């Protein structure tokens, strides 16, 4: 949005309009500031629920990340309908974890890949803290390319954000960064 709070078309929206498939991926939550900048049009980066509601409006083909920060709570802390049925009603298949993605992706028209149920929705674990079945940014990126290149298409646009590296650097956490 610009300073007057008018929506501005994003580069990802321009790619979609040009007939390309579009994916937005991150190692943090899908409704965080950087991924949201490619599909959402909300005046405040902390409007996580409202940002998530913009996801199906953008009608992109693939989204992935840690999860969603406030899937049932509005910016003003009011209870709201879960975003997941809204995504499914808009034609998205929601996969929880890499194995679930592999099982569902072949028949999906549009995909949202997030961590398994019970994992921290704000982000993927750091590599230093990762367990065997944790979703990784490499798996997300591989899945996005696989999904965006299936079938007939005019190419694709893919945004991949390693948001966790930013957090580790801000924390001056050299062991995690290295």
Give each language-model segment a name.
Residues 33-38, 119-131, 152-178:
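Active-site His/acidic residue clusters
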Residues 5, 17, 138-143, 149-153, ...:
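C-terminal non-catalytic regions of proteins with extracellular/luminal or membrane-system context
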Residues 1-7, 12-140, 145:
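Surface-exposed loop and adjacent secondary-structure segments within mature catalytic domains
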């Amino acid at each position: 949005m610009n300073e007057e709070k008018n929506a501005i078309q994003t580069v990802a929206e321009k790619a979609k309009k040009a007939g390309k498939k579009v994916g937005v991926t991150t190692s943090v939550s899908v409704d965080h500031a950087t991924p949201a900048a490619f599909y959402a049009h909300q005046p405040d980066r902390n409007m996580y629920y409202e940002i998530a509601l913009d996801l199906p409006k953008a009608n992109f083909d693939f989204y992935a990340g840690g999860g969603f920060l406030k899937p049932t709570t509005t910016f003003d802390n009011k209870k709201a309908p879960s975003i997941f049925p809204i995504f499914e009603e808009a034609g998205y298949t929601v996969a929880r974890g890499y194995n679930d993605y592999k099982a569902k992706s072949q028949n999906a028209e549009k995909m949202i890949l997030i961590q398994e149920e019970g994992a921290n929705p704000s982000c993927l674990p750091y590599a230093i803290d990762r367990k065997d079945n944790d979703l990784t940014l490499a798996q997300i990126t591989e899945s996005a390319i696989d999904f965006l290149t299936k079938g007939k298409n005019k190419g694709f646009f893919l945004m991949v954000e390693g948001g966790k590296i930013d957090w580790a650097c801000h924390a001056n956490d050299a062991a995690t960064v290295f």
